[in-house]
Amino acid sequence: KPDYAEAYSNMGVALKDQGKLEEAIAAYNKALAIKPDYAEAYSNMGVALKDQGKLEEAIAAYNKALAIKPDYAEAHLNLSFELLSSDRLKEGLEEYEWRWKTTKNVETKRQFSKPLWDGKKNLKGKKILLWCEQGVGDTVNWSSRLPLILSLTDYCTLECQEKLVPLLTQSFPNVEIKAQDRRHDSLRDDFDFHMPMGSLYKHFIPEISQNTKPDAFLTPDPVRIKFWRKRLESLGNGPFIGVSWKSSNISPQRLPNYAPLSEWSPIFTIPGVTLVSLQYTDFHDDLTEIKNKFGVSVHNFDDLDHYNNLEDVAALCAALDLVVSTTSTVPLISAGVGTVTKLANWRQ
């Protein structure tokens, strides 16, 4: 069936996932030649163009999809990412609200009887509930702006992933930090307004624009920082550099962010430093490969649960001189505690 537009679009998705971006775009164009009003093909093409670094062309493709299908939530969400990457903050954050209408997220939105805060209602004397969405790293990132909410109210509760409770409690003593609990959402009466954390930025665009890089906002236990400094000194001489080369979440979409270990040679071969692993999953074989390939040891503290004990991970990061990492929770924590952090952005 040579005029099967959907097959060409599906082929494009498969080619894109294999990193064959030019071939993927050619497949999408074939689909559109057959079916010019094919919104999904335009949106898929936008993703491939984005992966090529062609942000303006990607934005144009998403807008074509939306001209055909104005309520296409996935295209709105994809558009939001490219607008934000293009520093079009206000437009991008408005489009980001469409995330709740996508197939992936529609079931995860919490349903309360209390109203969503619109950014305009006076919060003086009122209590607001902020609730986490998506991953641990997102929660850490968004928590950097909690002081903006605290400038409007003295009564703020944040419900987050359980393993973040100790670290965020230590860092934000004026916020009630609790593990998320969705069991009785519709019956709750312990707050006046609520808001998902991903909507926080939208209501503070002027403040964020003036201060795009907030100061250290995470506060690990000073006793644990001192403990980890002594542990580091037992390994050898500094500077002590923490490294993390992959995430536990490696989907086809995220795979381009994570380079093979061979690409890390400029870091692993720095002379006169002590390297420390900040990996939290599937890394023991990697440590052996690094030793065999580069003749260097990346030290790992086996008694530290990097995945769950984030309070101690933050303390270790604070004790380090530098962190080099790919996109994951690690650089958000290390930058959050004020340690110089370099992000290895392979996709770009």
Q: Where are the model-predicted features located?
A:
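Alpha-helical solenoid repeat scaffolds of the TPR/TPR-like class and their adjacent stem/linker regions
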Residues: 1-348
